[in-house]
């Protein structure tokens, strides 16, 4: 089985919170598709709570689109990592890491402004596969942690595993 790109980086050297341009590919028509690693926690040191991650999944995707989508950038998907240390974001276009950091920070500020569990989008049994597995307070705690620590740029050449 081929080794996925996400496993070709040394997770022991990865800083967090951080933004890493994980991959850029081009479609046959010439559009750039960029994949970003949006790291919330240091791998193997911290982990986001299950309910907080799920609530962030519902909130973060919309907030990031509000702050990052433009005539040159369109987010395709934002999904949590199985290790619960971050999210992957796939998009059409090639925003800078600085632009992504600004959108990430503003999205975390937006999470802190959500006042009620009732304000979480798609939080119902028809649109969510685990609609009872949410915690706005845990999502806010994660967001505040990101803002308190600050978001850095994670450079691939600094965390590349040798021999891969």
Swiss-Prot record:
Co-factor binding comment: Binds 1 Fe cation per subunit.
Function: Involved in the synthesis of autoinducer 2 (AI-2) which is secreted by bacteria and is used to communicate both the cell density and the metabolic potential of the environment. The regulation of gene expression in response to changes in cell density is called quorum sensing. Catalyzes the transformation of S-ribosylhomocysteine (RHC) to homocysteine (HC) and 4,5-dihydroxy-2,3-pentadione (DPD).
Lineage: Bacteria, Pseudomonadati, Campylobacterota, Epsilonproteobacteria, Campylobacterales
Assembly with partners or alone: Homodimer.
Obligatory cofactor(s): Fe cation
EC number: 4.4.1.21
Keywords carried by this UniProt record: Autoinducer synthesis, Iron, Lyase, Metal-binding, Quorum sensing
Family under the similarity heading: Belongs to the LuxS family.
GO MF terms, alphabetically ordered: iron ion binding; S-ribosylhomocysteine lyase activity
Name of this protein: S-ribosylhomocysteine lyase
Gene Ontology biological process terms, A to Z: quorum sensing
Recorded name of the encoding gene: luxS
Catalysed reactions, as listed in the record: S-(5-deoxy-D-ribos-5-yl)-L-homocysteine = (S)-4,5-dihydroxypentane-2,3-dione + L-homocysteine
InterPro entries in alphabetical order: LuxS_sf (IPR037005), Metalloenz_LuxS/M16 (IPR011249), S-ribosylhomocysteinase (IPR003815)
Enzyme class: lyase
Binding site for Fe cation: 54, 58, 128
Pfam families: LuxS (PF02664)
Gene3D superfamilies in alphabetical order: S-ribosylhomocysteinase (LuxS)
